[in-house]
Amino acid sequence: MIESTSAKLQNIFLPSTNKALARVLQDIAPEKFAQLSQAKDLSSILTSIFKDSATNELQNQKLLELLQNNPTLKELGSIKTSMKDFLLLLQNEKQNLPIEKNLQAMMGDIKNIDDKVLKAKLENSGIFLESKLKNLNPQDAKIQELLSNDFKAALLKTKQELQNIPFENKIQLLNIVDKLSLQIDYYQLLSHLSNGSAMYIPYQFDALEDGSFSIKKDTNDAYFCDIDLTLKEYGDLHIRLGLFEKKYLNVNISTPNKELKQRLQSALQELKEQLTSTGLSVKDIRFIDPMQTKYASEDDDIKLGFEVKI
C-alpha cells in the first residue's frame, strides 16, 4: 500500500502551482488574492480565507464547495478526451515534437497492463513523485529520470517545446495542454480536500469513456478499492474490492445495465479463478443494487489513501 500524509501535501497545493486553486481564488478580492499567492502552504491559504472556521475540516469543506461549484471547472470534461484531441491534432502537423514519442508511450494500452509497470507509475507520479523530488538535490541527475515518467511533468515539457516550434495549430495545442494541466490540478485538489490525494495514470482503453479508482484503509487495516467506470457501450459500472487480513477478498459489483450484468455473471467463475491465482482467498462476489453503493467508506474510520484517474 502506498500511503501519503498531509505534511507531504501541504506545500504542493499553492495558487502558483495548482491552476484549479488559482481559478477558484479569482472570485476573491484582488488584494486578498495577491496576499494568498505568497502563502507557503494550503493550510495558511485556508486560514486566510476562512478565519471564522473552527477547524481545518470546515475550511476544507468550504473550499471544496467553491471548487465543485466553479462554472469553469464544472465544464472541464475528461482528461482522456482532452488527451485524444491533443494527439489527433498533433498528427496533422508536419513536424514532430521531441517529446511526442514519450507521450505516445505513456498512453499504454490497458490490455497490456503489467502489475510491476503500474506500481512503478503510481510510485513515480503525483504526490509520491513530488515528495521524492523534495528530498533530492536540484542538481541530482535522478530528477530527470523521475520526471520522464510523470504525466504532469511531460505536459510542462510539451508546452515548452510547443512554444519553440512554429506549428500551424500551435494555439489550439497550447490551449489543450493548459486544459490538461488544469484538469489534473482540479482532481488533485478535489481529492486532497476530501482528505486524500489524486493522480492521473494515462492508459488507452477504447471501451472506456471515463474512469477512476480510489484506495482506502480503515482503522482495522482493511483495504477498500472503489472502481468507477463509464463504458461506451454499457454505461456505468461500479466495483468495490474489500481486502481483509491481507488475503481475504470480497467483491461487490453494481451496474444499471442488465446486459452487462448478465455478461459479468456468466464470467464469474473465470474472474474468481484469476483472482485466486494471485494468492488471494476470494470469500464472496456479489451483485448489488446501484442504489446501495454508499458503503461504509463514508464513515469516519475509513480514510482515503489516494485516487487515480484513468
Residue ranges and their predicted role:
Residues 1-236, 242-310:
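Extended non-catalytic alpha-helical interaction modules
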